[in-house]
Amino acid sequence: RLDFLSLKYGISKYYLSHMFKEQYGTSVNNYIINMRITKAKHLLRFSDLSTTEIANRVGYEDVNYFIRSFKKVENITPGEYKKKW
């Protein structure tokens, strides 16, 4: 991601990361994770998709990594989140 953007705009990955964090207050990776988790939360609430299907739809190939990432952000597992809503 950063490689593509840095080549496209002719700036270093370091500078691009620095500017992104300055503008948005978070790293590119954290921003992407938060966007994925936000989309996953929507799918958990409004679809009947399985956790594996949701993980794949939001860009995770490994469902266990998705569950760990979700729990790190939301402090509950995707399954617990779905039951809550």
What is each stretch, according to the model?
Residues R1-F4, H42:
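Acidic/proline-rich low-complexity IDRs
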Residues D3-S12, L16, F20, I54-E61, ...:
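Append "Primarily bacterial transcriptional regulators
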Residues E22-I67, K83-W85:
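Terminal helix-turn-helix DNA-binding modules in bacterial transcription factors
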